[in-house]
Amino acid sequence: MPLNIEDKKAVVAEVSAQVAKAQTIVVAEYRGIAVGDLTKLRAAARQQGVYLRVLKNTLARRAVEGTPFAGLAEQMTGPLIYGISEDAVASAKVLNDFAKTNDKLVLRAGSYDGKVLDAAAVKALASIPSRDELIAQLLGVMQAPVSGFARLLAALAAKKAEGAAPAEAEAAAEA
């Protein structure tokens, strides 16, 4: 059922709002994917905070008009699904991971930091750890010396406690 002009304006406004907050947009061709598989993809995207939507390309072009993602408009042909995310790597990661298990999803292009990316660059972007993973790695590196020092102190305290126990036993035996 075709959308009337008001519905189209609403869709463009909704997508424009998502694009305004986004760091990355990834575009993939979804021709021939089963509905169940597409539902799994949408669930994975929701879990990662990725706005995933199948759009008419004309509406998508209007939504990115005047934004850093405007260069992506040339890639908007054919049946496409759009992954839009505030996290720099989330949309690339979700669509790339799904494309690994479902060969009918083909990564076409993406845009990050005002630059249009080809499929290989989107795959490279997907291989970068997310912000949360990087923070976890940094905390692990920062905690390693502290936890090592804490283990050293615990071992030293245990050794002193063992040394103090025989000394107390000797003092009790002498008395």
UniProtKB/Swiss-Prot annotation:
Keyword Transcription in annotation: no
Protein origin, superkingdom: Bacteria
GO annotation, cellular component aspect: ribonucleoprotein complex; ribosome
Gene Ontology MF, one: large ribosomal subunit rRNA binding
Pfam families: Ribosomal_L10
Listed GO biological process terms: translation
Family: Belongs to the universal ribosomal protein uL10 family.
Function: Forms part of the ribosomal stalk, playing a central role in the interaction of the ribosome with GTP-bound translation factors.
Annotated protein name in UniProt: Large ribosomal subunit protein uL10
Organism: Cupriavidus taiwanensis (strain DSM 17343 / BCRC 17206 / CCUG 44338 / CIP 107171 / LMG 19424 / R1)
Lineage: Bacteria, Pseudomonadati, Pseudomonadota, Betaproteobacteria, Burkholderiales
